[in-house]
Amino acid sequence: MIRGFIGVQIAPEVRSRISQAVAQLAPEISGIRWVREDNFHFTLKFLGVIEEPQIEPISNALAQAIRPFRRFTINAKGLGVFPDVKRARVLWVGLEGIDMPALAKSVETVLEPFGFPRENTIFRPHLTIGRWRHLSGSHQELGGKLKRRNDTEFGESAVDEVVLFQSVLKPGGAVYRPLKTVRLADDRMTS
């Protein structure tokens, strides 16, 4: 059994800029578990546990989902939290890109017949950089720190492929391993 998700990798230079911001934030924000730079990605759809024989059919469905899309650019900008500042659990970098909501919807549509239910939440493109177990410190203080960085630009990243990842849980944190990659430009799959 494999823990899987569908995601998009972020350009190395954007990951590096975000990592630099994390290094500046780390002393200011306590009680958070930071995501490692090599794990920065944008999740289109979390799958959970899948069986190995499902990998190929899921990859084929993914190719169908992205067929109408061509390479596009996303912009990483600003910081925010889910669900809100008073109950912060996830610290994220915002992602802007005109085709992202349509791409996520297309992926959800083709994966629904495999038993992966549609999300009941509003789609908010983001890149998780940290998670809290319990928020410590003032909510107003956290809100102020986020507001000061709301316009921080981390750069643009091309979206030219979508990846089926395996998430391997290890004592030091999750490790993400690409299982299948589908390119937006020509729908070819690679292992």
Task: Provide a role label for each language-model segment.
Residues M1-S191:
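Histidine-dependent nucleotide/RNA phosphoesterase domain, centered on the 2H-phosphoesterase fold
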